[in-house]
A protein has these predicted regions:
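The DNA-contacting recognition helix of HTH DNA-binding domains
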Residues: 69, 121-123
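Membrane-proximal linker segments that couple transmembrane helices to downstream signaling/catalytic modules
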Residues: 2-112, 116, 128-131, 138-150
Length: 150
């Protein structure tokens, strides 16, 4: 059953790819522009930690970078090969891992930590964490020898 579900997911992604490519077929965003924009975006995320805002929209980020939402969407989907939310959530997961390594956060619940990292719900945090890391947040905390309140 699990294998069938996985195969359906793979087939679904294969069907989506041509749709995404068709959407950007007439794009005039250059590789050089993507490289530059990706660098600016990474610097912005590391310096300003925009990902901790759970309400951050792609339009907000595009305005900060002074590009269109189309260009930013192209950057994520074609150049970085991930969607906007996966990009943000990757930073949020790294933030979570950074926080749980600090003793001062050991009294926080997982939900509170997830919110500090920018996740808007416990469910989306748990789902994405397990998808990316392969274990639950609780299992991760135990694996690094820490404890928390949940």
């Amino acid at each position: 059953r699990r294998r069938m579900k996985r195969n359906n997911l793979i087939q679904s992604k294969e069907k989506q790819q041509p749709v995404i490519e068709e959407k950007y077929r007439k794009s005039n965003v250059t590789e050089e522009e993507c490289r530059r924009l990706a660098g600016e975006l990474e610097l912005l995320m590391q310096r300003d930690r925009l990902y901790v805002n759970p309400n951050l929209k792609i339009a907000d980020l595009a305005a900060i970078l002074n590009v269109s939402t189309y260009t930013l969407s192209y950057l994520f989907n074609q150049y970085l090969d991930k969607n906007y939310y996966d990009y943000l959530n990757d930073y949020r997961i790294e933030e979570f891992k950074r926080l749980v390594d600090k003793d001062e956060y050991s009294k926080y619940t997982l939900t509170a930590l997830a919110e500090l990292c920018g996740f808007s719900s416990r469910t989306s945090f748990f789902r994405y964490f397990k998808k990316v890391i392969g274990i639950t947040p609780n299992e991760y905390i135990r694996s690094i020898g820490k404890t928390n309140e949940e």
